[in-house]
Regions:
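N-terminal glycine-rich flavin-associated loop
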Residues: 117
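Surface-exposed amphipathic alpha-helical tracts and adjacent flexible/coil segments at the periphery
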Residues: 2-42, 48-50, 55, 74, ...
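Alpha-helix C-terminal capping segments
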Residues: 42-45, 127-129
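Gly/Gly-Pro- and Ser/Thr-rich, intrinsically disordered tail segments characteristic of DNA damage-repair
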Residues: 98, 132-133, 137-144
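Alpha-helix capping/helix-boundary segments
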Residues: 121-122
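Glycine-rich, positively charged N-terminal anion/phosphate-binding segment
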Residues: 59-76
Length: 437
């Protein structure tokens, strides 16, 4: 039985008093594609977030932050004890260097905690202009071996996010070779190209994935056409929706976190700056709960069944451990291709807390329905909707998306409901199977 090595705990944002069993865990690093997603990541327990500004980021369509919004985001996160890393991870052309010095100085001024960089030229400028700022090497830099990691460490990099195509054994060897921090992707979408360096989008649509504008053609539905039979399309697999020959399952290393901790991972990263705020909140919540579970136990303790149940409510393209145990096989490709719709969908976001919360509806729901509030940890509160009122006090039978509403709720066991913004409510979209007996 291997306990966690003792150290000072990370900032906990007041969720509970420090426990004598607290141990240092890897940083839980969450995506923040916009202000609402940032708030979700903070609320549900991220230790740090990564986000992009209006320039230099590989997620041009993620919403991102203006300079003023970046300033506010850093202030909000720091007020909660959460670190902020700013992505500047495009593959830069000469024209991209105009204004880079000023932008780096701005990021230093607002006290960003680190810079995520892939391009050696941008890295060199950052080392010259803001030498005191930590530099995190992006996975797009394709660090696949210990000698490469040592090279980047010698260049002044303080953290490396290795290529996603490495096994646990390879990561452990890298850990032995370098002292720089290692940040490992543990959950989210996978790209079929080598650690995201893809030209398929540029070739098919003119949108350059390496400059933040990926059109995600790996998610398109493809059919095969033989040149002498124009108009006759043959599915590569017998599926009337076409074939998803490029479409990998999603990464999920939830049950492998103890091995990554033992191997020396310093940060565990969740992919998804372009995912929904519901995705960000539920995935961060799940991984936070898992880390806290092991914080108070030994790493050999198995996760209780409710973790698998919670994971099943998130949805996605199926789950894969990717290269964790070696090269993935055909079973790690998703033959049906499209992301599955989970049986649970977002219902509302809490805007004002309390027993009768003010919420922003995200999907329709109605009076008399049972929805579920997602507390911190994995505490879920099923609630029956007794009444719905709009901001003018009028009672409604049904909630429509994007409306602000006051809910009167009762929990199944009459337990007090401690709703806090920006907590999430979800609703079941598919009724569970009934027992025929």
């Amino acid at each position: 039985m291997t306990p966690l090595s003792p150290s000072a705990p990370l900032p906990r944002r007041g969720r509970r008093p420090p426990s004598p069993l607290d141990r240092q865990l890897p940083e839980l690093l969450a995506p923040a594609g916009d202000r609402d997603k940032l708030a979700q990541a903070i609320h549900y327990g991220a230790d740090a977030v990564y986000l992009g500004g209006s320039r230099y980021s590989l997620r041009a369509n993620a919403g991102n932050f203006s300079d003023q919004e970046l300033r506010e985001a850093v202030m909000l996160a720091h007020g909660a004890g959460v670190r902020v890393y700013v992505a500047l991870n495009i593959f830069a052309h000469q024209r991209d260097f105009a204004g880079l010095d000023d932008y780096l100085l701005f990021l230093r001024e607002i006290a960003a905690d680190g810079l995520i960089i892939a391009d050696p030229g941008i890295l060199a400028v950052a080392r010259r202009v803001v030498p005191q700022m930590p530099i995190h090497l992006s996975t797009q830099a394709n660090v696949t071996n210990p000698e490469s990691a040592a090279f980047w460490q010698a260049c002044g990099v303080s953290r490396i996010n290795p290529a996603r195509e490495l096994s646990l054994t390879e990561l452990a060897k890298m850990r032995e070779r370098v002292t720089t921090e290692l940040e490992i992707f543990v959950h989210g979408a996978l790209c079929i190209s080598y650690s995201g360096r893809c030209f398929l989008s540029l070739h098919l649509t003119g949108r350059d994935a390496n400059r933040g504008d990926c059109a995600h053609p790996c998610r398109y539905r493809y059919r095969l056409e033989e040149e002498r039979r124009p108009g006759q399309f043959f599915p590569i697999e017998e599926d009337d929706r076409g074939s998803y020959i490029f479409n990998a399952k999603d990464l999920c290393l939830l049950n492998r976190l103890p091995q990554l901790i033992r191997a020396g991972a310093d940060a565990l990263k969740i992919e998804g700056r372009m995912k929904s705020l519901f995705y960000v909140g539920t995935v961060v919540r799940l991984y936070r709960a898992a880390l806290d579970f092991w914080r108070e136990r030994c790493l050999d303790a198995p996760l209780p069944p409710e973790f698998a149940e919670e994971l099943s409510k998130i949805g996605g393209r199926g789950q894969s451990e990717n290269f964790f145990s070696g090269p993935p096989g055909p079973e790690d490709m998703q033959p049906g291709g499209a992301a599955s719709n989970p049986d649970w969908a977002p219902a509302a976001i809490v805007r004002e807390g309390g027993g009768s919360p003010l919420v922003e509806a995200r999907n329709p729901f109605q009076k008399g329905e049972t929805i579920e509030y997602l507390g911190q940890g994995l505490k879920n509160y099923p609630c029956r909707i007794i009444a719905i009122h709009d901001q003018n006090g009028r009672e409604l039978e049904r909630a429509n998306p994007n409306s602000l509403l006051r809910l009167t709720l009762t929990t199944a066991d009459n337990e007090p409901l401690d709703c806090r913004p920006p907590g999430l409510f979800r609703r079941q979209t598919m009724a569970p199977p009934t027992n025929p007996n």
